[in-house]
Design a protein with these regions (language model features):
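Generic enzyme active-site microenvironment
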Residues: 273, 307, 336
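Short, acidic/hydrophobic/Gly-rich beta-strand patch recurrent on exposed beta strands
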Residues: 21, 238, 275
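Conserved nucleotide-binding/hydrolysis micro-motifs of P-loop NTPases
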Residues: 14, 25-27, 73-77, 91-93, ...
Length: 464
């Protein structure tokens, strides 16, 4: 554990109030050097934990600001160390001045994520809970908030601990049998019972692995590719969905040559919209590169919005059949007839959609420019996302590192099942059980190396 005392601004710039966190063995002593309580005779070191003390930050005889200081004593603090939090006015000058005074009296400026890293190293939380802190800070919807809170409160950790306990019991039975292999009359592990235990563990790990598709969509947004021919109104639709001028709109064909991505929350679900280059035959090298990226993004999307210019719908349907439908297997495709405000005979639009009715493609007619039926399109997107309602009691994997570790653990438990089925020696089975335990422990940070820890915590903000 580090013996130095760290400090950092914990609040965003521009607010009326700012907060500076101080943590480490000398946190209270250093804060006392620059802080004087307003009540005469009172000293910060004598204050009770979890209380606020009003007073002044000073530089020699000069008062810098009126502040409130909260005090936390080890181990009952976020980091598990002695800590103080200085609430001052949000002026950038005041905040920087207080930091300078703290550093001048023995503090060091905290590295990104160092407070949470100290909490992890001090046993206040495991690594998955520490990562949930970053997810909570970055949460942009009710669902991402609920998942982060569940993980931070230890829901995922308890699931992992239960699995590890079962696996440790499993391997102890196997290894005990190995230790007494010379005593043929003794049988410590009934293979049929071990098979049932392995099956139960496999089901839990498999459920966690499968939950990642939902968790990843909730955390990073459901990827929605907006594709179509040039000048069909793709960028206009993106701007309408985002309620801002995110993409350049022009009557010139091929204006969008690169991929544009942005997110929006609809009905509590985050969607990641991907505006792509229009599909057409062209000799323009740069535009062709954009079209190649269009098909790449189409492969990555879960939902595809195929935008068709309703004024010329009949000519665009063949392209849908030959180029788009074969690439949309397993995806949800919504055929969007745009520019309906320019169509004189609306009956031509249903006739066009009838040609793809057998493919279970959903169809809708809109005017992105006039915002006609946009609300209906949004409801179709929410329905197509088909995400379950998430509660704080649900254990859903959202982190790619956790997913990879669980995938390796699942492979190991599959080898255990196979070994038991083939009646292999306990030596081989025990090795795979230990590998499964290793991967589960890696998630909680029990076997994680310093390089991995550094990569995780350096993505936190400095004050966390």
């Amino acid at each position: 554990m580090n013996q130095d005392t760290i400090c950092a601004i914990a609040t965003a710039q521009g607010g009326a109030i700012g907060c500076i966190r101080v943590s480490g063995p000398d946190a209270i002593k250093i804060t006392s050097r620059i802080f004087t309580p307003a009540r005469k005779g009172k000293k910060l070191k004598d204050a009770k934990p979890y209380t606020l003390t009003f007073g002044h930050i000073h530089e020699e005889e000069n008062i810098i600001d009126e502040v409130l200081v909260s005090l936390f004593r080890a181990p009952h603090s976020y980091t598990g160390e002695d800590s103080t939090e200085i609430m001052c006015h949000g002026s950038s000058y005041i905040l920087q001045k207080v930091l300078q005074l703290l550093i001048g009296n023995g503090c060091r400026l905290a590295a990104p994520g160092e407070y949470t890293q100290r909490a992890f190293l001090g046993g206040k939380m495991d690594l998955s809970q520490a990562e949930a802190v970053a997810d909570l800070i970055a949460s942009t919807s009710a669902a991402t908030h609920r998942l982060a809170m569940s993980q931070m409160r230890g829901g995922f950790s308890k699931e992992l601990a239960s699995l590890r306990d079962q696996l440790l019991h499993f391997t102890s039975l196997i290894e005990l049998e190995l230790d007494f292999s010379d005593h043929e009359e003794l049988e410590f592990a009934d293979r049929s019972e071990l098979c049932l235990l392995a099956d139960g563990i496999e089901q839990v790990i498999s459920r966690l692995v499968q939950s990642f598709s939902v968790g990843n969509a909730i955390k990073n947004g459901v990827p929605v590719a907006i594709i179509g021919e040039t000048n069909a109104g793709k960028s206009t639709l993106l701007n309408a969905l985002l309620n801002e001028e995110r993409a350049i709109v022009s009557d010139i064909h091929g204006t969008t040559r690169d991929v544009i991505e942005d997110t929006v929350n609809l009905g509590g679900i985050t969607f990641r919209f991907i505006d792509t280059a229009g599909i057409r035959e062209t000799n323009d090298t740069i535009e062709n590169l954009g079209i190649e990226r269009t098909f790449q993004k189409l492969e990555q999307a879960e939902i595809v919005l195929w935008i068709v210019d309703a004024t010329n719908a009949v000519s665009q349907i063949p392209q849908l059949t030959t180029q788009i439908l074969p690439r949309c297997e397993g995806k949800r495709l919504i055929l969007v007839f745009n520019k309906t405000d320019l169509v004189q005979d609306a009956s031509t639009i249903p006739n066009s959609s009838f040609t793809v009715a057998a493919t279970n493609v959903q169809c809708i007619s809109i005017s992105a420019k006039g915002r006609t039926n946009l609300d209906k399109l949004q409801q179709m997107l929410i329905s197509a996302a088909n995400l379950p309602t998430v509660t704080q009691n649900d254990v859903i994997v959202t982190n790619i590192r956790h997913y990879e570790a669980l995938t390796h653990a699942l492979e190991a438990i599959h080898r255990v099942q196979q070994g038991l089925a083939e009646n292999l020696s306990g030596d081989f089975v025990s090795q795979d059980i230990r590998e499964c335990i290793f991967h589960l422990s890696d998630i909680a940070g029990e076997v994680t190396n310093d390089m991995v820890l550094g990569n995780i915590f350096e993505h936190f903000c400095i004050g966390k």
